Amino acid sequence: MRIKLVAVGRLREEAYERACAEYARRLAAYARLELVEVRDARIADSRAGLLKEGQALLDQLHPGEHAVLLDSGGKQFTSVELADWLENHTVQEPVFIVGSSHGVAPMVRERAQMVWSLSKLTFPHELARVIVLEQLYRAVTILAGHPYHHG
């Protein structure tokens, strides 16, 4: 299984960086993981910034990849449902997209085949990356019968 996570901006907090590195290391035992960071626009005009970031995100998507946008308005899964989705979604390779703190451009939303919500709560985009990697790790361990998930 191949999984890609594309995110806007660098992780600036060391704690988030360490957590992402740990879950990426764990995931590597079960899947080929590719982590891609695109530059945040840092433009005063947020609309222009979103468009620039949006194009950078779209440039990372390739034919045969299934774009999954992370957004609070998307579909929510239990960990077991996410594992089932990963197992039954083998036709295309999933690419999970985490936008900036300003969200994503409409063109990214239009390209996404699925929108996934981690929660009804809003998280900082750096923390969202940690949660995505942890949930993906949890999902692959559920599929492998590993005891990490106790639910």
From Swiss-Prot:
Keywords, sorted A to Z: Cytoplasm, Methyltransferase, rRNA processing, S-adenosyl-L-methionine, Transferase
Pfam families: SPOUT_MTase
InterPro entries for this protein: Alpha/beta_knot_MTases, RlmH-like, tRNA_m1G_MTases_N
A Gene Ontology term for the protein's cellular component: cytoplasm
Enzyme class name: transferase
Molecular-function GO term, any one: rRNA (pseudouridine-N3-)-methyltransferase activity
Major site of localization recorded for this protein: cytoplasm
Keyword flag Methyltransferase: yes
Location(s), subcellular: Cytoplasm
Superkingdom of origin organism: Bacteria
Function in brief: Specifically methylates the pseudouridine at position 1915 (m3Psi1915) in 23S rRNA.
UniProt similarity note: Belongs to the RNA methyltransferase RlmH family.
Protein name: Ribosomal RNA large subunit methyltransferase H
Lineage start: Bacteria, Bacillati, Cyanobacteriota, Cyanophyceae, Gloeobacterales
Record gene name: rlmH
